[in-house]
Amino acid sequence: MKKTNIALIGLLMGWASIANAQTVKSPNGNVAVTFSLTGNGVPTYEMTYKGKAVVKPSHLGLELAKNKHASKGMNETSLMDGFEKTATKTTTFDETWKPVWGETATIRNHYNELEVDLNQPSSKRNIVIRFRVYDDGMGLRYEFPQQPELNYFVIKDEHTQFAMASDHTAWWLPGDYDTQEQETQESKLSEIRKRFRDAVNWDNSSVSVFSETGVQTSLQMKSNDGLYINIHEAACANYATMHLNLDDKTMTFESWLTPDATGLKGFMQTPCETPWRTVMVSDDARDMLANNLILNLNEPCKIEDTSWIHPTKYCGVWWEMIAGGKSWAYTDEFSSVKLGQTDYAHAKPNGHHPANTANVKKYIDFAAANGLDQVLVEGWNIGWEDWFGHWKDYVFDFVTPYPDFDLKGLNEYAHSKGVKLMMHHETSSSTQNYERHMEDAFNLMNKYGYDAVKTGYVGDIIPRGDHHYSQSMNNHYLHVIKEAAKHHIMVNGHEATRPTGLCRTWPNLVGNESARGTEYEAFGGSDPNHTVILPFTRLQGGPMDYTPGILETQLSTWCNNKSYVHTTLVGQLALYLTMYSPLQMAADLPENYQKYNDAFQFIKDVACDWDDSRYLEAEPARYITVARKAKGTNNWFVGGKTGLAPHLSVLKLDFLDKGRKYEATIYADAKDADYEKNPKAYTITKRTVKKGDVLKLQQVRGGGFAISLKAL
């Protein structure tokens, strides 16, 4: 690792102090952040990129609750104004670190930092506001040293502002305390209010909107003068998830934290700090996708031995329930289940429970024959008969299989084939029930050789009245990750809070859902633009288990479901490149892959871990093309995905090694392909290519392309 950490003074490294204001610039000078105090002591900052306004002067501060649990109780005062600057410190930092898995083999972490120490004389309290400024953005956070007048405090609201320079185009999700499974909207900031109610998926199992101008992060925007701006957060731990509320008269966003069951936003004990509030910026959309600011603002890996953490390609017993109407439950005889009392031994099977020994063996055989690492099995454990909609506490025990699932025998069979089973822990959002059973559940996994678990949090939270994205729930998710690490278990969290880069610190967090995934293609479908927006928004905080690979796009060909996938078949292949994750699912049924075995070859070949990634072209909601070099090889893969509008990609193969030839296998939309009218029309061609060659590939509506480049 290469590191420098040097205290610097004055203008030599781009810092300036003029009267009350102090400016810190990025290492290349493009990004500048200026801090100042207003006349009444309100902390204020502003941000520019190449001289253009990114964030206009914006206030900082926290409103504290008058609460008996705070150190000052009902005499509490806020940390909003009345501050004096007592000291500042400027430093630079430069390191190169290696992720356990990722889009590149190494990541550079290079920033200039400004630390501002503030004192509030009226309360005799001190806080620190820290800015880290990168070439492609900045992060700021509040820090609270331990001190006699500030030991315990309760957050009523955080008032971090982001004042936009104009009425930007935005790609946004409705602000919600419990779900991100919405379809991203594209509009001007000024149009959010009138479009808000129609943007909400009111049929979701948990919907908790808070304002008709509230949006979620990561929020992607584009200014009229060509700046791409993204607001998010990094390293959210022991703190509530941040949303944004827009004042659509001034175009100013303000942080809006998720409350817990008490309605309060955070219970804090010093010394402590908030997550980083991040603003990424560039005049090139490709830079937004290659940005590592979120990861860099997280702490280094805390797991000493990471040899057990590995990228994984898997299939599973899932799509036939999601799309095909089969059941997670074993029997239809029980309308109510009590753990330890309900007798499954004499229950009549319902005949449509696919998590059974015979069916799972078919998936194991399929995985073994096609080089897949694991098989996910949902619905293997007792309790699914009344699992949802009752706000039930003791819903699963996570260790007792249904009578038709041979837990021991199936794991032995899988291991004999060189395959592992992937565990499934749906919690039904009863977090206290999961925590009381977690140790036994993880011990069971260790006993039978499982090394990965997919968790789920469908429904309303227990403890009742809490929200999915509150401080207490964020603590629960992190607790699961830490406990899993002790057992050498990788975690793929579904319905959990959106990621903020904690996978750097805890790389056993190999996947999250936290957005509208492929399952919605079975519920009426997602807009074709959806998958060329998510990399700019949801994926900024970490990889997504999007579960791509649905090659039989017309569901009615195999089940009683009139929905269809809103991409072409080749568009599904492209997602393995454009939707980065070290955990990739081949989500379709084995028999559907057999129907399109030539196209399935790409899913078998494509890697899940990379030494290098090059974003070749990108525009939010329009198109994304990326080339990635497979870890430890000379082989490259290229994926291009387009939205609703067709797109011609002209690819210059400048990223290939000079002097080396490659066998290119090109999977492309046929000329007459269309995601609605002719989604399964595709071509596969082979040719030899070298560095400097140019490929022209036409993508149709909802289409894409995928290329395998094997070094010769």
Ranges and model annotations:
Residues 570-617:
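Catalytic cores of secreted or luminal carbohydrate-active enzymes
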Residues 269-362, 370, 374:
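An acidic-aromatic substrate-binding cleft motif
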Residues 23-304:
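N-terminal accessory beta-strand-rich subdomains and adjacent acidic, glycine-rich linkers
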Residues 378-564, 568:
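Aromatic- and carboxylate-enriched substrate-binding clefts and catalytic-loop regions
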Residues 686-712:
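C-terminal beta-strand-rich structural cap/linker in extracellular carbohydrate-active enzymes
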